């Protein structure tokens, strides 16, 4: 019998940076997934803004304690959001469900992290003793309940049909960064990779605020919904924000990058620039 690896003890130097090697895996028919994801986002009438900001920060915090790689961190965020969407579709009282998730958020996060970790590597588990220790240390008002955790884990797996959502946003950011920043020799690879992960955490945590800041300029709600649902555009804006924080203020370089990314995303360059500025503004 193979020994299971406790993910909380696994951590490598590359876990804290973007995967900027040439074998990232986002090269075969890669835009189809994003087109499909955009259409699903447009069709989803269930807003998750009341739950996801706090959930995103909690996932990032617990991933740091468990020393989980960022690929699991960002995929866990997307998987939790998918869980919320799928449940709201079927739940007769969505407000009650939202309250239940918020009240028991640490348990939901642990359940999601456990599922995503196993899907990334079937031999890995989260150390149960460490789960209890971390939750009690970070959420002292939370009463530890193994039965409740087991019930939530079962509910999560059943609702998601044992499927997780790999982070399309992370994949696109890695691809665009390799093609549009590293090839220009603007900054060191390790610096760009570390900066990219930090910016992605901000984008995930502040996504609702970032898009809300653009609403005063919106003339067509349907087009804005499509814009918000497109992870390629968000990835492009994130990469141009990385470029900006690399002190690459040369207007010609920035314009060339935005123009090329706009062709990949099938969007006007100014829309990428507006979204980039919104990202930068939530940081400043």
Feature roles, as predicted:
Residues 1, 110-111:
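Hydrophobic alpha-helical targeting segments used for export or membrane insertion
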Residues 1-16:
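PEST-like, low-complexity acidic/proline-rich intrinsically disordered segments
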Residues 12, 25-27, 31-110, 116-266:
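Cyclin-like alpha-helical protein-protein interaction core
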Residues 267-284:
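Eukaryote-biased recognition of C-terminal alpha-helical segments
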């Amino acid at each position: 019998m193979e020994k299971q690896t406790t993910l909380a003890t696994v951590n490598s130097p590359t876990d804290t940076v973007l995967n900027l090697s040439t074998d990232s895996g986002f090269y075969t028919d890669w835009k189809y997934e994003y087109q499909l994801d955009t259409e699903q986002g447009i069709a989803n009438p269930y807003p998750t803004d009341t739950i996801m900001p706090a959930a995103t920060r909690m996932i990032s915090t617990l991933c740091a304690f468990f020393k989980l790689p960022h690929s699991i961190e960002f995929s866990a965020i997307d998987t939790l959001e998918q869980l919320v969407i799928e449940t709201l579709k079927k739940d007769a009282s969505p407000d009650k469900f939202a309250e239940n998730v918020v009240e028991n958020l640490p348990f939901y996060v642990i359940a999601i992290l456990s599922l995503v970790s196993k899907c990334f590597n079937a031999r890995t588990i989260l150390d149960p003793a460490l789960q209890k220790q971390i939750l009690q240390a970070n959420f002292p008002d939370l009463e530890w309940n193994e039965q409740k955790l087991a019930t939530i884990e079962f509910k999560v797996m059943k609702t998601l049909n044992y499927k997780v959502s790999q982070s399309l946003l992370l994949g696109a950011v890695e691809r665009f960064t390799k093609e549009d920043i590293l090839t220009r020799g603007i900054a060191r690879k390790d610096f760009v990779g570390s900066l990219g992960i930090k910016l992605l955490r901000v984008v995930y945590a502040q996504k609702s605020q970032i898009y809300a800041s653009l609403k005063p300029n919106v003339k067509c709600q349907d087009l804005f919904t499509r814009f918000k649902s497109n992870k390629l555009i968000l990835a492009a804006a994130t990469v141009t924000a990385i470029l900006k924080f690399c002190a690459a203020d040369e207007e010609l370089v920035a314009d060339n990058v935005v123009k090329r990314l706009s062709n990949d995303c099938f969007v006007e360059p100014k829309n990428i620039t507006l979204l980039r500025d919104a990202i930068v503004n939530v940081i400043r």
